[in-house]
């Protein structure tokens, strides 16, 4: 009996030490925790009708160039609101070089896209729908398509008081809808555990939380309710092999160099994705990308800005090795010295930041039978 009591005491002490270690790590940075209410801009208040309209538009192929790339084509609910590939499919005739990010919880970011090129969902929507390697839609043409559909004319009149649909209003509606694509804290093991349900998170995940906030140091960049500091770092990640090997990707990537205002030399030697540099034009920012949220990552692989890491096990192994070897890597990354069990524990905790089941929205019924000629 004395031996059993000793074991129980040791386990209790270990649990206390684990919690204390995690709390100490959290104290240095904004703590992890449930997401606050979704921020809503004063000039785009949310209503049920606006959200419903935005959902239809998010799914509607008519808001793209040739009718083949609606928003949902790269952000499928069943694929974690990404497209499931290492790099985004891109518009027909082009090939992208970055991973299609999940839009879950995108309402909480202060900068969107991997390189932080826009600061609101209202600005993000046209960048995607009209971007040459994404939707490639012409604004005036898409606007006229909406005006051919009586149901949309009536819906825009109801929501915005407009006689005719305008794309600025369409993008506002899409942004309102995206603000509903968020995690539910009651279905997230870590959030439930923090709220007092100590059975919500496994012992493995609890050990992983201590590592996350302590030895592994993940909390230094993945902090706050979003599990992201929303800053930009160069992780030394290798380029996706297709960047050097795929002619169509090279053509598209070099065209983008001109679009982003790089130098002639930068165009001629476009052998890497320069990331945040495209926004700042500061050479120190070459290869930097925004810290992604860790919420819902259980469902959003492949990972990193170019999808080169297929699983969370690979992600942890990458950081355990001290990151990659590409030029300009942040000095924040050092080898972690995690054991095999510690790596498993860390993955278990990161998965506990996702809901127990993926967030799924059913396809909406789209109005009208008019389609662009290219799709007929």
From Swiss-Prot:
How many cofactors are bound and how? Binds 2 heme c groups.
Q: Name one GO cellular component term.
A: periplasmic space
Which Pfam families did the record assign?
Answer: CCP_MauG
Which Enzyme Commission number(s) are on file for it?
1.11.1.5
Q: Recall the GO molecular function terms of this protein's record.
A: cytochrome-c peroxidase activity; electron transfer activity; heme binding; metal ion binding
Which reactions fall under this protein's catalytic activity? 2 Fe(II)-[cytochrome c] + H2O2 + 2 H(+) = 2 Fe(III)-[cytochrome c] + 2 H2O
Which coarse location class applies to the principal site listed for this UniProt protein?
Answer: periplasm
UniProt keywords (A-Z) are: Heme, Iron, Metal-binding, Oxidoreductase, Periplasm, Repeat, Signal
Lineage: superkingdom: Bacteria
Give the signal sequence positions: 1-24
Asked if the Swiss-Prot or TrEMBL record annotates the protein with the keyword Membrane, the reply is: no
Occurrences of domain Cytochrome c (ranges)? 49-157, 203-354
Entry binding sites for heme c 1: 71, 74-75
Cofactor names from the entry are:
heme c
Q: What residues bind heme c 2, as annotated?
A: 218, 221-222
Where in or outside the cell it occurs: the entry states:
Periplasm
- Asked if Oxidoreductase is a keyword of the record, the answer is yes
Report the InterPro entries cross-referenced here. Cyt_c-like_dom, Cyt_c-like_dom_sf, Cytochrome_c_Peroxidase/MauG, Di-haem_cyt_c_peroxidsae, MauG/Cytc_peroxidase
- What does the subunit section of this Swiss-Prot or TrEMBL entry state? The iodate reductase (Idr) complex is composed of a molybdopterin-dependent iodate reductase (IdrA and IdrB subunits) and two associated peroxidases (IdrP1 and IdrP2).
Per its database record, what is this protein's job?
Answer: Involved in iodate respiration. May play a critical role in detoxification of inadvertent H(2)O(2) generated by the iodate reductase IdrA/IdrB.
The protein's name is Cytochrome-c peroxidase IdrP1
- Species of origin reads Denitromonas iodatirespirans
Q: Which gene encodes it?
A: idrP1
């Amino acid at each position: 009996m004395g031996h059993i009591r000793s074991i129980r005491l040791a386990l209790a002490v270990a649990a206390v030490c684990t919690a204390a270690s995690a709390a100490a790590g959290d104290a240095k940075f904004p703590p992890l925790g449930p997401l606050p209410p979704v921020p809503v801009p004063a000039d785009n208040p949310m209503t049920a009708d606006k959200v419903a309209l935005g959902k239809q538009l998010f799914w509607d192929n008519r808001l793209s160039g040739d009718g083949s790339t609606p928003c949902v084509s790269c952000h499928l609910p069943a694929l974690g609101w990404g497209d499931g590939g290492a790099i985004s499919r891109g518009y027909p005739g082009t090939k992208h070089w970055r991973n299609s990010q999940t839009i879950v919880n995108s309402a909480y970011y202060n900068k969107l896209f991997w390189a932080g090129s826009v600061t609101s969902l209202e600005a993000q929507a046209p960048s995607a729908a009209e971007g040459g390697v994404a939707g490639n839609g012409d604004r005036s043409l898409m606007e006229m398509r909406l005006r051919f559909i009586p149901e949309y004319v009536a819906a825009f009149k109801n929501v915005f008081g407009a006689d005719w649909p305008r794309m600025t209003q369409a993008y506002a509606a899409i942004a309102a809808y995206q603000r509903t694509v968020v995690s539910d804290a009651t279905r997230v093991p870590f959030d439930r555990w923090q709220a007092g349900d100590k059975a919500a998170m496994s012992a493995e995940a609890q050990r992983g939380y201590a590592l996350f906030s302590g030895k592994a140091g993940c909390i230094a960049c993945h902090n706050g309710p979003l599990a992201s500091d929303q800053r930009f770092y160069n992780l030394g990640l290798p380029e996706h092999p297709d960047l050097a090997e795929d002619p169509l990707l090279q053509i598209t990537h070099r065209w983008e160099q001109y679009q982003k205002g790089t130098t002639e030399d930068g165009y001629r030697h476009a052998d890497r994705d320069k990331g945040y540099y495209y926004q700042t034009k500061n050479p120190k920012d070459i290869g930097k990308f925004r810290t992604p949220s860790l919420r819902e990552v259980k469902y959003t692989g492949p990972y990193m800005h170019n999808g080169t890491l297929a699983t969370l096990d690979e992600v942890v192994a990458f950081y355990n090795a001290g990151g990659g070897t590409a030029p300009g890597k942040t000095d924040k990354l050092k080898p972690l010295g995690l054991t095999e069990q510690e790596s498993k524990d860390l993955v278990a905790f990161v998965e506990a930041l996702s809901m127990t089941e993926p967030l799924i929205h059913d396809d909406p019924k789209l109005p009208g039978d008019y389609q662009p000629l290219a799709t007929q």
